[in-house]
Amino acid sequence: MESHNTLNLDMEKDQEKAFDYSKRAQWLRAAVLGANDGLVSTASLMMGVGAVKQNVKIMILTGFAGLVAGACSMAIGEFVSVYSQYDIEVAQMKRETGGEIEKEKLPSPTQAAAASALAFSLGAMVPLLAAAFVKEYKVRIGAIVAAVTLALVMFGWLGAVLGKAPVVKSSLRVLVGGWLAMAITYGFTKLIGSHSHMYV
């Protein structure tokens, strides 16, 4: 009987550990995705502006505005999303336990919002830092592409490890997606910019 109880306790501990690891992996994966979003959107924005305005200050200010706007948007979106999940879980706990709520098991909307904004900001800092200290336009564009490429590969690898997906395929998918976003933004802005000069 005693050995049976010990076995049950060990199984419960293993389940708790697996649950904790799963929650941690979800948070880390969300952080990687947020950072990747900040990286690609800010770099694409800077590349787009750089297609028509070669001034370093304009590129940096545009990137910084993208960082602030994106971080705020991510934080608000995550807060609303997690708060909805929080309300659902509270209602479910009340039904199951007759009114008792275990707050430590509930998601924190504030923490989720802060983590999302921070992850986005960290990703967005990569192209900003790459461009900040380069005055020559072509070298600056090259520095942004190189820095973003390295970061995309790293984020792709991290996402694959956390999601237990094939590393090479995942990294290539993230890399190609980032390159496409930058190339499309640059190309369209360049096209519109060149046509707008004809009517000025």
Swiss-Prot record:
It comes from the Eukaryota. Induction: Induced by iron supply. GO terms for molecular function: manganese ion transmembrane transporter activity. Keywords: Ion transport, Iron, Iron transport, Membrane, Transmembrane, Transmembrane helix, Transport, Vacuole. This is Vacuolar iron transporter homolog 3. It catalyses: Fe(2+)(in) = Fe(2+)(out). It is found in: Vacuole membrane.
